[in-house]
């Protein structure tokens, strides 16, 4: 195979790579401010690598979310909620309504303050 044959082969491989790209993206339920079961699905963008379900009172949020931002602080700020029960997961359609009954994380700002206060007191007592 000469130079021309190698170039043709390379070109074909490049075209195959472009057209056969799997482009797999995570699929999540997405119904912001929903109070009922969510049945609308969406394909998440590449920077949103997890599905979120968060419950605050009667409001239930379903959406794509960045996994590293799945913390009480981030969720509380973004959703403007003071108390949340939430769950982030990384499988297709894993943020279904019943998942919070089986687990999830419930925190409020008061709980976070109660958890942090002993550590602050200990650090303060160690400081001369």
Curated annotation (Swiss-Prot):
Q: Which UniProt keywords apply?
A: Cell membrane, Disulfide bond, Glycoprotein, GPI-anchor, Lipoprotein, Membrane, Secreted, Signal
Provide the lipid-modification sites (GPI-anchor amidated asparagine): 102
One biological process term from GO is: negative regulation of activation of membrane attack complex
Where is carbohydrate linked to this protein? Answer: 43
Q: In Gene Ontology terms, what is one molecular function of this protein?
A: complement binding
- Explain the purpose of this protein: Potent inhibitor of the complement membrane attack complex (MAC) action, which protects self-cells from damage during complement activation. Acts by binding to the beta-haipins of C8 (C8A and C8B) components of the assembling MAC, forming an intermolecular beta-sheet that prevents incorporation of the multiple copies of C9 required for complete formation of the osmolytic pore.
**Name this protein carries in UniProt:** CD59 glycoprotein
Origin species, per record, is Callithrix sp.
